[in-house]
């Protein structure tokens, strides 16, 4: 141990009346804690009950957990209406706070207004790093843009019918059809599936929707890769993935049948050269890629 470090520990022991061993033990624990724990993003999850499906809530919250901690979970809608009955069954289980909003005027969406007002109130608390907006409604485009202007990260979740304006206003947009396919797969493995034919029909429909994969945007992906490479002509997978999302927030490898971006890259051998490189001072390997000549 260096003399400078030794002097620091001796001073701590004198100041706090601790033994030298106790100071070393506490300091080592703090060092391990600081190195192993990365701060998680504090996220506000706001759900538009009129434009979201309760059937995907478990998969939705699991997806959100990939981005950070759902510190606030609220859902907005008229829960006296029959259309919201499916949501009422899951609110308590997933600790989601319902915000009742009656339709005061025909033709006006009071739910949208309530959600936007709450979002702005939460924004000005300065307690959050980002927002998760669960809706397929383009009326929230302005809200997403406002949150971004304040420096917060915006994650959007909605169906494929969601207008481009809202999807592109988010930093990242996830299609709920992808999450629905996860629910369908689990349900098919469950022995309770045979109890209701209606459930089986819904499952098959959900799977069919996802199996109809869109055409792979080869030109867009290669163009993004060209902008991601360094001076050597290679790009790390992380840099490439980040650039893809910036250009097209709803880009998701799962839409094309691959669980992760790395799986997609490895499968497209006709498009990419790939290398796994050891990072200095670590056993971890990083995937690098470039376009094939």
Regions found by a protein language model. Give the residues of each.
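Intrinsically disordered, low-complexity glycine/proline-rich and charged
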Residues: 145-188, 272, 278-279, 287
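Helical mechanochemical/support elements of P-loop NTPase systems and associated helical scaffolds
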Residues: 45, 53-56, 60, 83, ...
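Compact, basic/aliphatic-enriched, mixed alpha/beta core segments that act as assembly/interaction modules
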Residues: 107-169, 245-255
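Residue-identity detector for glycine
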Residues: 4-7
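Domain-level signal for Mg2+-assisted phosphodiester chemistry and nucleotide/NA-binding surfaces
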Residues: 16, 20-124, 145, 153
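Intrinsically disordered, low-complexity linkers and terminal tails enriched in Pro/Gly
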Residues: 19, 25-40, 179-214
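N-terminal regulatory modules in eukaryotic regulatory proteins
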Residues: 189-293
């Amino acid at each position: 141990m260096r003399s400078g470090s030794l002097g620091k520990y001796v001073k701590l022991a004198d100041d706090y009346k601790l033994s030298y061993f106790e100071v070393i033990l506490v300091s080592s624990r703090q060092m391990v804690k600081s190195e192993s724990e990365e701060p998680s993003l504090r996220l506000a999850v706001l759900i538009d009950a009129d434009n979201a499906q309760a059937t995907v809530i478990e998969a939705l919250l699991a997806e959100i957990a990939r981005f950070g901690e759902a510190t606030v979970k609220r859902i907005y809608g008229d829960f006296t209406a029959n259309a919201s009955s499916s949501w009422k069954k899951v609110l308590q289980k997933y600790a989601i706070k319902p915000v009742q909003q009656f339709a005061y005027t025909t033709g006006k969406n009071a739910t949208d207004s309530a959600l936007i007002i709450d979002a702005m109130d939460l924004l000005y608390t300065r307690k959050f790093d980002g927002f998760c907006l669960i809706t397929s409604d383009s009326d929230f485009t302005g809200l997403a843009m406002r949150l971004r202007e304040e420096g917060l990260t915006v994650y959007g979740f909605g169906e494929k019918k969601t207008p481009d304006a809202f999807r592109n206003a988010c930093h990242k947009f996830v299609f709920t059809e992808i999450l629905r396919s996860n629910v369908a797969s689990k349900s098919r493995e469950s022995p309770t599936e045979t109890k209701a034919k209606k459930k089986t029909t819904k499952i098959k429909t959900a799977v069919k929707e996802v199996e109809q994969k869109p055409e792979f945007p080869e030109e867009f992906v290669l163009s993004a890769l060209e902008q991601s490479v360094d001076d050597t002509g290679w790009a790390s997978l992380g840099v490439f993935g980040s650039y893809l999302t910036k250009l097209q927030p709803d880009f998701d490898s799962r839409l094309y049948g691959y669980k992760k971006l790395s799986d997609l890259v490895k499968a497209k051998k006709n498009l990419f050269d790939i290398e796994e490189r050891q990072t200095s001072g670590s056993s971890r390997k990083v995937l690098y890629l470039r376009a094939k000549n």
